[in-house]
Amino acid sequence: MADIVVMGAGLGGVIMAYEMKDQMRPEDKITVVTKDPIYHFVPSNPWVAVNWRTRESVEVDLAPTFARRGIDFKPVPVEKLDPEANSLTLADGSTLKYDYLIIATGPELAFDEIEGLGPVNGHTCSICHVDHAEKAAVNFEEFCKNPKPIIVGAVQGASCFGPAYEFTFILDTELRRRKIRDQVPMTFVTAEPYV
């Protein structure tokens, strides 16, 4: 019997848990450990930011979803990883032993590395997390009341540029639907060496 632990339950962690469950032997056990009991389908965040989707429509409660597939689930943050002992110490003080560990914790957003960047302490919107996308949706509705030039893009250090392009086209579409696109000069900014 092998104890398989997936650390993280975002897009990569959930897919990995499903794939591992399909491939493992009947006597093996798989456990997913993550800090958030709710899964947010990140690829839909650009839609949330223009009110094409709601937060509720892109969320899944992980406990019943994993239970249906026979995957153990611990919605508790990991405090310590001990590779020599093949164990994780969780925030509730419990220890989780493993034979195989898959780390799929996703990105750590670093808005503080650029002054003025970010939806919390900065002056920019973000679609990186559903919380950010909801705030962007509120800002977008206010923006549409008084349309003006807008800048869309991704900064240096971004690990994924695709959503910035997607959001640009979504924004263009929604502004056209609202018949205000002609009032919104749009500039796309990227740290990529070429487009």
Model-derived segments and spans:
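Beta1-alpha1 glycine-rich phosphate/pyrophosphate-binding loop at the start
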Residues: A2-D72, G157-V195
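FAD-binding core/adjacent interface of flavoenzyme oxidoreductases
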Residues: A2, R68-E166, I170-K179
